[in-house]
A protein has these predicted regions:
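Short edge beta-strands and adjacent turn/loop segments
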Residues: 1-7, 31-59
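N-terminal first-folded block
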Residues: 6-38
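Active-site-proximal loop/turn and secondary-structure-junction residues that shape catalytic pockets
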Residues: 10, 43-45, 96-98
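A short amphipathic beta-strand at an alpha->beta junction
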Residues: 36-39, 84-99
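Short active-site-adjacent helix-start/loop capping segments
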Residues: 47-49, 64, 100-102
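Mid-chain, well-packed structural core segment of small domains
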Residues: 50-91
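Short, highly charged C-terminal tails/helix-capping segments
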Residues: 91-113
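Short acidic DE-rich linear segments
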Residues: 114-120
Length: 120
């Protein structure tokens, strides 16, 4: 269950839905067990310099080593920059969960989540 957050100066014209779909596609291509990416965008109207920072949070797993992370980072940077149509300061951070991180799905009867099957 990866998480994606983008924080950016709001003078950047970004189609966040396509942006998130493309990032999720890269992550799942590199790691088919990653699953749905919970994604959030934070455009900022008060800023100094045009910029974007993308933060990717993943669970710690044995196969997500330095080599995996470097390849993922390079591919994510390439795909993210396809969405940037103007010059900007760019930052990308990939981080891994700590030992006491909890993640799951909280379900309420008769309630649904987007893109989650109700069977489980």
């Amino acid at each position: 269950m990866p998480h994606v957050e983008i924080k950016y100066s709001d003078n950047l014209d970004i189609d966040t839905k396509q942006f998130f779909d493309d990032i999720e596609g890269v992550i799942n291509k590199k790691d088919s067990g990653a699953g749905e990416c919970k994604s959030r965008a934070y455009p900022c109207s008060e800023y100094k310099y045009t910029h974007i920072i993308v933060s990717i949070s993943l669970l710690t797993k044995a196969h997500r080593d330095k080599e995996f992370t470097l390849k993922l980072s390079n591919e994510l940077e390439r795909v993210i920059k396809l969405h940037l149509k103007q010059s900007a300061y760019f930052s990308l951070n990939i981080e891994y969960s700590q030992a006491y991180y909890t993640t799951n799905i909280h379900r309420i009867d008769a309630d649904t989540l987007d893109d989650i099957n109700s069977s489980s």
